[in-house]
Regions:
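Conserved acetyl-CoA-binding loop-helix of GNAT-fold acetyltransferases
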Residues: 75, 81-94
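Conserved catalytic-core motifs of GNAT/GCN5-like acyltransferases
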Residues: 103, 116, 120-140
């Protein structure tokens, strides 16, 4: 049985190292920004601990009233393609009593297309007709075109606009109009 647990303060360095290995600087916060999020009651990081005690995988998420937003999902490069990412995602989805949402890069590269396929195999739907941009996470950065993926099927434009507004104001601390 997979043991997923909430990140402890002493796990921060290993978690941030995995985030840094898995996401370019423009798609994640710096260490101080990441650490500051840990005091937000809606934010959490769940980890899959290796038998050795290290961090094999992580999921950073935001628990909102109507959905859970999976902000960052990363698997240690040495553990990829072994099925633990899918198992962890399925286990987390089974524990939440509401829909989940995440952002994914447009399928413009083979890796981005494979990533979207992974999420589709685990119950997510790509809302491809909705134009969405992830605000810049670093000063001077550019917004990134992304797809919003949701569980429970495709969402209406009004539902996606509400999700976008909440993500931009709560997760990214920006207004949707300000990020364009």
């Amino acid at each position: 049985m997979m043991q997923i647990e909430r990140m402890r303060p002493e796990d921060f360095d290993a978690v941030f190292r995995l985030l840094s290995q898995s996401f370019p600087a423009g798609e994640r916060r710096d260490a101080a920004g990441q650490r500051a999020l840990l005091s937000d009651s809606a934010y959490r990081i769940d980890i899959l601990r290796a038998p050795s005690g290290g961090v094999q995988a992580l999921m950073a998420s935001w628990d909102f009233d109507d959905f859970v937003f999976f902000e960052h999902f990363a698997v240690d490069p040495a553990c990829r393609s072994g099925g633990i990412g899918g198992q962890m995602l399925d286990a987390l989805l089974a524990c939440i009593p509401k829909p989940a949402c995440l952002e994914a890069e447009l399928p413009e590269t083979e890796m981005a297309a494979r990533r979207i396929g992974f999420y589709e195999r685990h119950g997510f739907t790509v809302n491809a007709d909705y134009p969405y941009f992830q605000p810049a996470l670093v000063p001077g950065g550019s917004p990134l075109p992304m797809h919003l993926l949701t569980t429970g099927g495709a969402r209406t434009a009004a539902e996606l606009r509400a999700i976008e507004t909440l993500l931009h104001t709560r997760v990214y601390d920006k207004t949707p109009a300000a990020m364009i």
